[in-house]
A protein has these predicted regions:
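Soluble catalytic regions of membrane-associated enzymes that act on cell-envelope
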Residues: 161-185
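Membrane-embedded alpha-helical bundles of multi-pass enzymes
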Residues: 1-164, 183
């Protein structure tokens, strides 16, 4: 999926960048991520869409700022991204888990990782693959092997992890979705 290439590009953008550059580049990547993926908010409120897009883009800028430009950059990018997604899933308003990396892996190769560690572990594995691609482009084969190995290990663990047994019990669930006029326009 495109997430791997996008994260490899983000890693390259952060390499050797000053704090101001990392913040700015993270912000621009945030705009590129959130402008299309939360555009549905315009159906509710266009000003709210603009505010949400800017707030989440700044959030990603801060994540990029937390990543050091040299030593440990790739490991820090993985950790900062997962921390950022975790915080976005809890704040503001009790959590706004929009545009998480796991959404792009629903039918992707890392989807089974959710059984072991949920959406955050999918995010971790996705960023690890992205940083592995980045390392390959710069001929850092050892770093690429470590990052890709970590992602593959998570994938293998998720495949061999126990799935549980059906209990034979059933429950009835009711789900109601509104769809009438809401006075939002």
């Amino acid at each position: 999926p495109l997430a791997f290439g996008g994260l490899a590009l983000l890693d390259r953008l952060l390499a050797g960048a000053s704090a101001r550059q990392r913040l700015g580049r993270g912000f621009v990547v945030g705009l590129a991520l959130f402008i299309p993926t939360i555009s549905w908010i315009t159906q509710l409120t266009f000003p709210g869409y603009l505010v949400a897009t800017l707030v989440f883009a700044v959030f990603l800028g801060v994540v990029a700022l937390a990543v050091p430009p040299h030593d440990g950059r790739r490991v820090a990018l993985v950790g900062a991204w997962v921390l950022g997604e975790s915080l976005r899933s809890a704040w503001p308003f009790g959590g706004v888990p929009l545009s998480l990396l796991a959404v792009g892996q629903v039918a992707g190769p890392l989807a089974t990782v959710a059984r072991v560690g949920g959406v955050l572990l999918i995010g971790l594995a996705t960023v690890a693959v992205g940083t592995a691609l980045s390392a390959l482009f710069t001929a850092e084969r050892r770093a690429a092997a470590v990052a890709l190995g970590a992602a593959v290990l998570l994938l293998v663990l998720s495949i061999v992890a126990p799935q549980g047994d059906p209990t034979g019990e059933t429950i009835d669930i009711a789900y109601v979705q509104g769809g009438g006029p809401q006075g939002t326009r």
